[in-house]
């Protein structure tokens, strides 16, 4: 039996910023972001980062399955780790867009925007939810039977979210 060890939240975020195995540099980036948030006026910056990342994480996603020639899309509840992984991936993608400015300033700015439910990462999250709504509307059957989508959603119940 394999026991999966949970990494702490900070380690998962630091590993996302790491490039070419340079852990020390990634840790410095994370600590500079925390210091910058505290100089802005946020009292508990660690808690602030965790809460804003939870605001960025999607709860539902879309699964594509091929049935014959057709490719159908179905909504699915995401695992907490998968939702967090998507949010960190979107954060890295939005920070990489602004190459001319400082990396730390971009990360801090994105966290502050996400705390106010704005920013690129939150837009990505709502775009994913738009796909989920489209998947639900496409796959519902008319009639008195339960729709296939409702059965799929019931089968993938949402697990404990932190």
Curated annotation (Swiss-Prot):
GO biological process: one example: translation
Keywords: Mitochondrion, Ribonucleoprotein, Ribosomal protein, RNA-binding, rRNA-binding
Compartment list: Mitochondrion
One Gene Ontology CC term in the entry: ribosome
GO molecular function: mRNA binding; rRNA binding; structural constituent of ribosome
Keyword Repeat: no
Major location (coarse): mitochondrion
InterPro entries (UniProt xref): Ribosomal_uS7, Ribosomal_uS7_dom, Ribosomal_uS7_dom_sf
Family annotation (Pfam families): Ribosomal_S7
Subunit structure and binding partners: Part of the small ribosomal subunit.
Family per record: Belongs to the universal ribosomal protein uS7 family.
Record-given protein name: Small ribosomal subunit protein uS7m
Source organism of this protein record: Dictyostelium discoideum (Social amoeba)
Lineage, top ranks: Eukaryota, Amoebozoa, Evosea, Eumycetozoa, Dictyostelia
Protein encoded by which gene: mrps7
């Amino acid at each position: 039996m394999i026991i999966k060890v949970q990494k702490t939240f900070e380690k998962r975020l630091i590993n996302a910023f790491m490039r070419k195995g340079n852990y020390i540099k990634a840790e410095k980036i994370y600590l500079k972001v925390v210091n910058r948030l505290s100089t802005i006026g946020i009292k508990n910056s660690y808690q602030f980062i965790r809460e804003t990342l939870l605001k960025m994480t999607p709860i539902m996603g879309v699964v594509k399955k091929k049935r014959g020639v057709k490719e159908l899309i179905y909504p699915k509840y995401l695992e907490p780790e998968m939702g967090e992984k998507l949010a960190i991936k979107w954060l890295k993608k939005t920070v990489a867009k602004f190459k001319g400015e400082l990396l730390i300033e971009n990360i801090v700015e994105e966290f502050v925007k996400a705390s106010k439910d704005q920013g690129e990462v939150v837009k990505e999250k709502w775009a994913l939810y738009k796909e989920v709504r489209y998947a639900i509307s496409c796959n519902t059957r008319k009639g008195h039977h339960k729709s296939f989508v409702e059965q799929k959603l019931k089968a993938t119940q949402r697990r404990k979210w932190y």
